């Protein structure tokens, strides 16, 4: 499964819909966030997706991991991957 890139400008509700759909279809969703704003949107989306899936009896668990330093616009940045599982 390909990691969905999250930006600070990503709408959390739209991302929550993506997460809920991926969980229903595959049981897992993967996100990649670079920067605090992007991580904030990802966390809000996971919380919203949990609310969307709760009536179906699906709960979520998330595993976080650092990616190696990546280059963005010539600067070294640290990315965080968020792997969301149904439980």
Spans of model-derived segments:
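C-terminal edge-of-domain segments
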Residues: 54-87
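Short, hydrophobic/π-rich interface segment
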Residues: 36-64
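Conserved mixed alpha/beta catalytic, RNA-binding, or beta-rich assembly cores of soluble enzyme
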Residues: 2-28, 42, 46, 50, ...
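Short beta->alpha linker loops
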Residues: 10, 34-37
